[in-house]
């Protein structure tokens, strides 16, 4: 199989990257009607598989789970997830032949063997659905011409997909139809009904393409969403301990600080996050972030270039073929970092203290969000897609670090995201070595002293204007307006 994106002429590549439209709520007036009476069979019962299935069933749809015989015989977690929630469970051979819609919600590395196994069993004219387009775009999977291929991708972890649905809301969702596989022209209707079934239409839906979803998703998760948070955690912890700050305090400040800081990001963008700082601290964070952007921009460009060219995917798939040798080694190495091995202390840290003593962390989030957004849009990805894959998902990933540090983050994200995270981290830590030499406890660990409270009015006005005028703030204000009812993470 060849990389699908690389087989397209340049003009088509650019058109697919730029495909993104925020859909009006009126476009979902038919609800789940297009899926009513259809048999939906889910393959994979992990976080996304289970929670999407629960939502679809609660929306009145017919949902069952097809699992491998060994998963059923050994009563693995996927079998437990499905059976304990009252779903019908069967083998591929038992359930796929009668399925109208097959939902492939397995991990990326399993997509090729899974699709090759189920495609011969699928009835003529059925629909195959994904929640991530890697298999189509990067692996170039060829799907039978009579099958409709769609994507419905919630922009949140599976647990949030369910939690928001139960609240009567939903999470922002991206939908797409694979243009090479829409023989009956029903792909869009099916994708819209699916998005309604999971509750996504209540939070906003982007009509996109498989290509735009994959190239933006890979970029976001490698850089700001996972790579920058891991890099920042390691560097900030080591710096604080080096400067004599109690290791338990440093560990707590970082483990729970990302979550608290990015909560402000979720509700009011980068502007609101920096507004939580005093004026002197805001200017300091702004200046640090601008310096970080200069240093890290070439690295962000490299990640985007490697994603666009397919080099990243090729390298990762070579590691798949080598039994994940690099991934597993990098995972083990992360477990041995000082931050990961140091328990959070018992000291209580107030919400505001996370901001006051975490100025550098705020700067890193700002730099990472803006760089990821700028790099994606420069590559032809539309602003709405870039927003969802940068600023929007950052609080959701930060929340996983609060639970069990970097281990939980890397366990929650996909192996694809984890692999890219490590690549970024390995390059970024040495890249920031000289920058970190000049960092002191005034920006990480202790906060600014009273003597640092002077502010130049003209400079403050300049900083505030720069914050509010960044393109990620403009598109974010519009998209967040559709998510006003989402619950607080913290």
Swiss-Prot record:
It catalyses: (2R)-2,3-dihydroxy-3-methylbutanoate + NADP(+) = (2S)-2-acetolactate + NADPH + H(+); (2R,3R)-2,3-dihydroxy-3-methylpentanoate + NADP(+) = (S)-2-ethyl-2-hydroxy-3-oxobutanoate + NADPH + H(+). Residues 18-208 form the KARI N-terminal Rossmann domain. NADP(+) binds at residues 45-48, 68, 76, 78, 108-110, 158. Keywords: Amino-acid biosynthesis, Branched-chain amino acid biosynthesis, Magnesium, Metal-binding, NADP, Oxidoreductase, Repeat. Residues 209-344, 345-486 form the KARI C-terminal knotted domain. The keyword Membrane does not apply. One of its GO terms (cellular component) is cytosol. This is Ketol-acid reductoisomerase (NADP(+)). Signal peptide: none annotated.
């Amino acid at each position: 199989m060849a990389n699908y994106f690389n087989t397209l002429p340049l003009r088509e590549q650019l058109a697919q990257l730029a495909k993104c439209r925020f859909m009006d709520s009126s476009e979902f007036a038919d609800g789940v009607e297009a899926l009513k009476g259809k048999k939906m069979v889910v393959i994979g019962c992990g976080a996304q598989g289970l929670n999407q299935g629960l939502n679809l069933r609660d929306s009145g749809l017919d949902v069952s789970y097809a699992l491998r015989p060994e998963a059923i015989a050994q009563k693995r977690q996927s079998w437990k997830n499905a059976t304990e929630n009252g779903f019908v469970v069967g083998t591929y051979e038992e359930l796929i032949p009668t399925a109208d819609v097959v939902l492939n919600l397995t991990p990326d590395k399993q997509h090729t063997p899974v699709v090759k196994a189920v495609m011969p069993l699928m009835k003529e004219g059925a629909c195959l659905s994904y929640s991530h387009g890697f298999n189509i775009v990067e692996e170039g999977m060829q799907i039978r011409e009579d099958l409709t291929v769609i994507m419905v991708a919630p922009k949140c972890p599976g647990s949030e997909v369910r939690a928001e649905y139960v609240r009567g809301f939903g999470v922002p969702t991206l939908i797409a139809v694979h243009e090479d596989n829409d023989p009956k022209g029903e792909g869009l209707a099916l994708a819209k009904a699916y998005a309604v079934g999971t509750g996504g239409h209540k939070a906003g839906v982007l009509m996109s393409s498989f290509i735009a979803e994959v190239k933006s998703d890979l970029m976001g998760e490698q850089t700001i969403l996972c790579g920058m948070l891991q890099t920042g955690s390691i560097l900030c912890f080591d710096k604080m301990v080096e400067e004599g700050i109690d290791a338990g305090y440093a560990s707590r400040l970082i483990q729970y600080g990302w979550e608290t800081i990015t909560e402000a990001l979720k509700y009011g963008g980068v502007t609101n996050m920096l507004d939580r700082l005093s004026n002197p601290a805001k200017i300091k964070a702004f200046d640090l972030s601008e310096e970080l952007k200069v240093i890290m921009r070439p690295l962000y460009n490299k990640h985007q270039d490697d994603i666009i060219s397919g080099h990243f995917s090729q390298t990762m798939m070579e590691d798949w073929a080598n039994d994940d040798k690099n991934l597993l080694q990098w995972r083990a190495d992360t477990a041995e970092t000082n931050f990961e091995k140091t328990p959070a202390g018992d000291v209580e840290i107030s919400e505001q203290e996370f901001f006051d003593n975490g100025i550098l962390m705020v700067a890193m989030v700002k730099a990472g969000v803006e760089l990821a957004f700028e790099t994606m849009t420069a590559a032809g990805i539309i602003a709405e897609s870039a927003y969802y894959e940068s600023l929007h998902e950052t609080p959701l990933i930060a929340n996983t670090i609060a639970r069990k540090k970097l281990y939980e983050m890397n366990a929650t994200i996909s192996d694809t995201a984890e692999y890219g995270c490590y690549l970024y981290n390995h390059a970024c830590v040495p890249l920031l070595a000289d920058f970190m030499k000049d960092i002191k406890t005034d920006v990480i660990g202790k906060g600014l002293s009273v003597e640092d409270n002077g502010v130049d009015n003209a400079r403050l006005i300049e900083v505030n204007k720069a914050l509010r005028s960044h393109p990620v703030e403009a598109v974010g204000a519009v998209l967040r307006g559709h998510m006003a009812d989402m619950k607080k993470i913290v």
